[in-house]
Amino acid sequence: MQIRGTARKYVYILTPYLIIDNTMQQALCLAAQAGVDVRIVTPKIRDKWYVHPATQFTYEELLRSGVRIFEYTPGFIHSKVFLSDDMVATVGTVNMDYRSFYFHFECGVFMQGTSAIKDVKDDIESILADSEEIVLSKWEKRPWYKKLWETLLHVFAPFM
């Protein structure tokens, strides 16, 4: 949360599971509305049938707030990376989901003021180039049954 709270130019997030609570969602939306370039990359190819629709449940509100969402298309991406303003980054095991935030003991490397941050940014830019951007106007037109499925699975989000 601190990285997103202090970002002035951008924050990039790579996560295989984007199952966030209202506080996290609001922080991302507020950052985007304040002019921060917020980009999130999730996998298009899923590893768990129930997690992907639960992840997609949050897309619409994030997109409406100006958050840019990308789905990595070449394969399943399992990276957990946060990068902000060419100044700070974390790389580790922390997913953006309830289990990582509240139940698991996760670890990560926090980087500040190191040349490794440029390498992290270069990697993220390469991943973004191989990803499909989700566009709000197209996203809103997805079938009703997909919206229903996302909503139903979101009910179980705290257990995922």
Place the predicted regions along the sequence by residue.
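PLD/PLD-like phosphodiesterase catalytic module centered on the HKD motif
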Residues: 7-12, 17-160
